[in-house]
């Protein structure tokens, strides 16, 4: 996912509390960030089902986006952590695998 995003000129902020920062950089060239660094997002991709991410409500996810009311909030729920009903009610544009 990260490599594909970079081909489009997107520089993702990657958060993975379980991964080793050193290993992520050495093996994949990916710098890991804390959740606090993941602010002002255009899009959020939940790609792993770690408990830290399962614990996030959709309201918590919404706080990660840019604060402008005009910006569309896009969520990719790769692991299907959220119900389709909750996603529809959230007002975010979403894709779910």
Describe the predicted segments one by one.
Residues 1-97:
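Structural/interface elements that position substrates and couple domains in central-metabolism enzymes
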């Amino acid at each position: 996912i990260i490599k594909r995003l970079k081909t489009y000129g997107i520089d993702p902020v990657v958060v993975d509390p379980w991964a080793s920062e050193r290993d992520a950089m050495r093996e994949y060239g990916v710098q890991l960030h804390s959740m606090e660094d993941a602010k002002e997002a255009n899009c959020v991709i939940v790609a792993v089902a770690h408990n830290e991410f399962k614990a996030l409500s959709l309201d918590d996810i919404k706080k990660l986006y840019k604060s402008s009311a005009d910006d569309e909030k896009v969520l990719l729920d790769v692991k299907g952590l959220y119900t389709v009903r909750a996603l529809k009610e959230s007002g975010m544009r979403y894709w779910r695998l």
